[in-house]
């Protein structure tokens, strides 16, 4: 069982001042040794120019998270649901950044290192993009970073939202952000409460899926539930390891091929996007959506 001492950081963490923008350089000596289990927290660190010494599932992170780029020096400590405690201990981190969900999956993390909690994406009653900002600010506070640094990251993201909003302003399509199952028969739709929905709102675009969702804002639906989305654009989340099989399954699915957006060529794949990311992921998604819709014109 976790104690307050285990989950709250002690004093004396080195300050990481003098940073600005996405991924600014910071002297290694001035940064704490941090292992990030939560990817949104890792993304936040990198946007401050702080490189974690360890991260959960580095290979998959690089497939899903475009920028800031994760350096090759970062040690993989295993998947978030089964952290390699020996690898974690060997890194001798000042602390580990995780969510309460991570601790449920691997509670013994706290036996190895001090743990600092960041908000989970399932935090209730918080708008999803605002939650991303809260994660950014929390990570900055943990790392001793000046509040002006996360503010500059948010400002940079807002500029990208504005540019993307201008690009898509001439498009009248509702947008469906979706993840197909590998068999191509069902879609996970990202509805209210998800990062894709928050970004669509930032871009003044309607979300195709306004139906019921689960606690994380997603809904698993059959293709027949997308028939009425005639005037829409479908943006498909790319999982690299599944892409070929998924495309093959969709191409062989008659219902998919009969959907109006598919027939009219209004389908694009979203590369290197992780729907559980933070502010940098939101800005990246805005760029992807703008590019996809512009190419459909």
Where in this protein do the model-derived segments appear?
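A short, structured surface patch at a secondary-structure boundary
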Residues: 33, 39-87
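Short helix-initiation/N-cap motifs at beta->coil->alpha
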Residues: 77-85, 213-223
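N-terminal export signals
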Residues: 6-26
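Extracytoplasmic substrate-binding proteins
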Residues: 113-182, 209, 275, 279-297
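Proline-aspartate-enriched helix->loop->beta-strand connector
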Residues: 92-98, 231-232
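Structured C-terminal subdomain patch of bacterial secreted/periplasmic proteins
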Residues: 33, 131-134, 229-297
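C-terminal segment of N-terminal export signals and the immediately downstream linker at the start
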Residues: 1, 22-36
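His/Asp/Glu-enriched short active-site or ligand-binding loop at hydrolase and phosphoryl-transfer sites
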Residues: 56, 193-217
């Amino acid at each position: 069982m976790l104690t307050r001492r285990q989950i709250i950081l002690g004093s004396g963490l080195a300050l990481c001042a003098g940073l600005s923008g996405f991924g600014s350089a910071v002297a290694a000596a001035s940064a704490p040794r941090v292992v990030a289990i939560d990817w949104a927290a890792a993304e936040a660190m990198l946007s401050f120019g702080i490189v974690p010494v360890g991260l959960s599932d580095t290979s998959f992170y690089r497939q899903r998270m475009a920028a800031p780029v994760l350096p090759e020096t970062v040690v993989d400590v295993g998947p978030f649901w089964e952290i390699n405690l020996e690898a974690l201990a060997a890194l001798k981190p000042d602390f580990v950044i995780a969510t309460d969900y991570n601790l449920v999956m691997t509670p013994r993390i706290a036996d190895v290192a001090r743990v600092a909690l960041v908000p989970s994406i399932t935090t209730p009653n918080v708008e999803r993009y605002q939650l991303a900002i809260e994660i950014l600010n929390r990570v900055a506070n943990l790392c001793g970073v000046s509040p002006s640094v996360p503010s500059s990251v948010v400002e940079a993201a807002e500029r990208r939202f504005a540019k993307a909003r201008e690009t898509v302003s001439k498009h009248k399509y509702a947008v469906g952000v979706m993840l197909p199952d590998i068999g191509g028969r069902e879609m996970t739709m990202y509805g209210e409460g998800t990062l894709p929905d928050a970004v669509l709102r930032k871009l003044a675009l309607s979300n195709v899926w306004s139906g019921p969702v689960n606690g994380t804002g997603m809904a698993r639906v059959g293709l027949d539930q997308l028939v009425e989305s005639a005037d829409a654009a479908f943006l498909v989340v790319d999982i690299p390891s599944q892409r070929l099989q998924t495309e093959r399954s969709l191409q062989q699915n008659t219902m998919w091929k009969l959907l109006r957006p598919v027939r009219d060529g209004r389908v694009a794949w979203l590369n290197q996007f992780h729907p559980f990311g933070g502010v940098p992921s939101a800005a990246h998604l805005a760029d992807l959506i703008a590019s996809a819709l512009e190419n459909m014109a």
